[in-house]
Amino acid sequence: MGLLAYLKTQFVVHLLIGFVFVVSGLIINFTQLCTLALWPISKHLYRRINCRLAYSLWSQLVMLLEWWSCTECTLFTDQATVDHFGKEHVVVILNHNFEIDFLCGWTMCERFGVLGSSKVLAKRELLCVPLIGWTWYFLEIVFCKRKWEEDRDTVIEGLRRLADYPEYMWFLLYCEGTRFTETKHRISMEVAASKGLPPLKYHLLPRTKGFTTAVQCLRGTVAAIYDVTLNFRGNKNPSLLGILYGKKYEADMCVRRFPLEDIPADETSAAQWLHKLYQEKDALQEMYKQKGVFPGEQFKPARRPWTLLNFLCWATILLSPLFSFVLGVFASGSPLLILTFLGFVGAASFGVRRLIGVTEIEKGSSYGNQELKKKE
């Protein structure tokens, strides 16, 4: 094992990475709070500044994927589709099977220059997650409780606000509503059978309200739908902890572009279109399982240096005073001061672990299990 590979497995190194992410995130969030004063003066300027502030935070996670773990992402698509990347507003539909599916989406956003302006329809609980939820709030992310009767007006208003967004945005939709688990899949297929819909093997039944509403509200702004089907070579099931330990994964993404004018305008037909899309996604996953590749040309967009440079800048700014402080604590010889510092380190470690836990499937939401609970 080389020195770098050894360092990637060390808890202290992970703690330092977490320290840089958390402290820089708090600085970024405070700066975002200050930019609220710009909103009544220039909404466009507020948005452009916050896109760059968000980039400075999100790119640290992308750096872990691209430069720390050296995970490779391969696109299976065509040149005409690639030529549109980063040059239009789009809605992205991504399967929700993996703990780092969002990170693979973000690395593609970064490579095509839309990471800071990327959007998502997110569950409202994430608004309370430090750094992540707070940054999303300033980015005008649309949050929902996943109860359509309560969400309808909030979602519509949030989507319509994005109609004049000044930067090209990729708006991510997880139409399945929650991460795939065997229990959720069984319940979902019971619902599909009751509605006379074909069963899906690798996906949950898509929930159509968010999709049809997004299409209706963003029509005229969004140019296309990108359907992205993600899987990993070697039947791997990657995790954010694995990335932190430097494990390398190989992600494959099949990307199909559908011009928005090809999507039916009425809600019922659009919902039927989405169900058909998920049947096609299921067939793509079956092909991947059998052949190990998706159809289409292979593209490997080059990683850019900005994510690494951004992290190194933050690390230089934040770790130098930290090391001086730690040396001062231990040089003082005060047991109380040393114990207090160690307690802070333990609390910080716990906090970082909780942030990572947000991505873990076994600690994910119970959304999708509700019908099972009713039966019990």
Curated annotation (Swiss-Prot):
Signal sequence annotation: none
Lineage summary: Eukaryota, Metazoa, Chordata, Craniata, Vertebrata
Top-level EC class as recorded in UniProt: transferase
Record-stated family: Belongs to the 1-acyl-sn-glycerol-3-phosphate acyltransferase family.
The record's note on its domains: The HXXXXD motif is essential for acyltransferase activity and may constitute the binding site for the phosphate moiety of the glycerol-3-phosphate.
Keyword terms: Acyltransferase, Endoplasmic reticulum, Lipid biosynthesis, Lipid metabolism, Membrane, Nucleus, Phospholipid biosynthesis, Phospholipid metabolism, Transferase, Transmembrane, Transmembrane helix
A Pfam family: Acyltransf_C
Chief place of localization: endoplasmic reticulum
Record PANTHER family: 1-ACYL-SN-GLYCEROL-3-PHOSPHATE ACYLTRANSFERASE GAMMA (PTHR10983:SF9), 1-ACYLGLYCEROL-3-PHOSPHATE ACYLTRANSFERASE-RELATED (PTHR10983)
Highest taxon of source: Eukaryota
Organism (species): Mus musculus (Mouse)
Topological domain ranges for the Cytoplasmic compartment: 1-124, 340-376
Chain span(s) of sequence motif HXXXXD motif: 96-101
Induction entry: Up-regulated in the heart by clofibrate, a PPAR-alpha agonist.
UniProt GO MF annotations: 1-acylglycerol-3-phosphate O-acyltransferase activity; lysophosphatidic acid acyltransferase activity
Transmembrane segments: 125-145, 317-339
EC number: 2.3.1.51
Gene responsible for this protein: Agpat3
Tissue-by-tissue expression: Widely expressed. Mainly expressed in testis, kidney and liver (at protein level).
Regulation: In males, activity increases in an age-dependent fashion, maybe derived from the induction by sex-hormones.
Reactions catalysed: a 1-acyl-sn-glycero-3-phosphate + an acyl-CoA = a 1,2-diacyl-sn-glycero-3-phosphate + CoA; pentadecanoyl-CoA + 1-(9Z-octadecenoyl)-sn-glycero-3-phosphate = 1-(9Z)-octadecenoyl-2-pentadecanoyl-sn-glycero-3-phosphate + CoA; heptadecanoyl-CoA + 1-(9Z-octadecenoyl)-sn-glycero-3-phosphate = 1-(9Z)-octadecenoyl-2-heptadecanoyl-sn-glycero-3-phosphate + CoA; 1-(9Z-octadecenoyl)-sn-glycero-3-phosphate + octadecanoyl-CoA = 1-(9Z-octadecenoyl)-2-octadecanoyl-sn-glycero-3-phosphate + CoA
The protein's name: 1-acyl-sn-glycerol-3-phosphate acyltransferase gamma
SUPFAM superfamilies on file: Glycerol-3-phosphate (1)-acyltransferase (SSF69593)
Pathway the protein contributes to: Phospholipid metabolism; CDP-diacylglycerol biosynthesis; CDP-diacylglycerol from sn-glycerol 3-phosphate: step 2/3
Membrane topology, from the record: Multi-pass membrane protein
Lumenal side: 146-316
Gene Ontology BP term (one): CDP-diacylglycerol biosynthetic process
